[in-house]
């Protein structure tokens, strides 16, 4: 499988036969001039030039746009709409009588001169093998997707696929989806076109049969017109009717042709709308993927926050339980201390009452001793009785 823009074996042999007598000096000069022209045209370093790029040299070359267009068409043998460095140099070599050999001549190819400036024929063979492998991979992908019959010969699709594979491999999936949808739309449009063409062919065949029948009837009328005049009147009327019918059928055929052109225009418009819808669907799909990614991130953040909230709630519950247990323990401890204080208070009161009772007994004994001594008598015995203490809750015992 040859790469795009590569001349065939017969063309290479013809070029070698025509240019075999050229010297190395003119060949190198022409190749340098071809390199300069190609680089002037390929300002964006795409690796290929189009008709518009070549027409950009109008200010540098004494040629009209029509002449430049004719030169481009003569160089574009494959009719791909673009020229690679190899095609451009080989074409100029054909015009000026200089071309690079592909067999035993160890000179550089124009494409190698542009890209590296110093590679040998072995490097060129390696690049061609890589290009053939890339072409085979591209056709394998198209066959796997089922779109090879529709898009297998589209060079623009192959160029875009190769560029995405090199620069943006993550977009190959989306590009393949777009190819599948575009192929489906093109197949549907092709089926509609085939249906319209078949209907038109059937209509044309029917019309041809009708016209042929009308012509045969006209010929019969002409033959009958040569008969005696007594029979010509009715036959003339019939002939007039047939001619009118023939004109009507021809008008119907013209209207059918107009209808076909209208349907073809509608078909092209629908195909353009399908492509635009596919592009919009691709954009919407990318927007949907972005929103889905954002939604997943938000959901993940919500789950993380909920997990943190549950952890905090569980920690709070554990803290509350711990505080409740501590308070219960402190309550029990305080109740025990209160009970101990009550017991201590009771013992202290009992001790105080016992002390007061002992004091009261000693006071009574002192009073009796004093009463036995001579002195004034007193009828009141409360002089030795101690008044009750406030707040004691006990009365002194009288003895």
Swiss-Prot record:
SUPFAM superfamilies: EF-hand. Residues 181-358 form a coiled coil. The keyword Phosphoprotein applies. It comes from the Eukaryota. Residues 1-25, 216-239 are annotated as: Disordered. Transmembrane segments: none annotated. PROSITE patterns: EF_HAND_2. Residues 33-61, 67-95 form the EF-hand domain. InterPro entries: Ca-binding_regulatory (IPR051111), EF-hand-dom_pair (IPR011992), EF_hand_dom (IPR002048). The keyword Hydrolase does not apply. The modification Phosphoserine is found at residue 3. Keywords: Coiled coil, Phosphoprotein, Repeat. Residues 216-226 have a biased composition (Basic and acidic residues). One of its GO terms (biological process) is store-operated calcium entry. One of its GO terms (molecular function) is calcium ion binding. Plays a role in store-operated Ca(2+) entry (SOCE). This is EF-hand calcium-binding domain-containing protein 4A. It comes from Homo sapiens. The gene is CRACR2B.
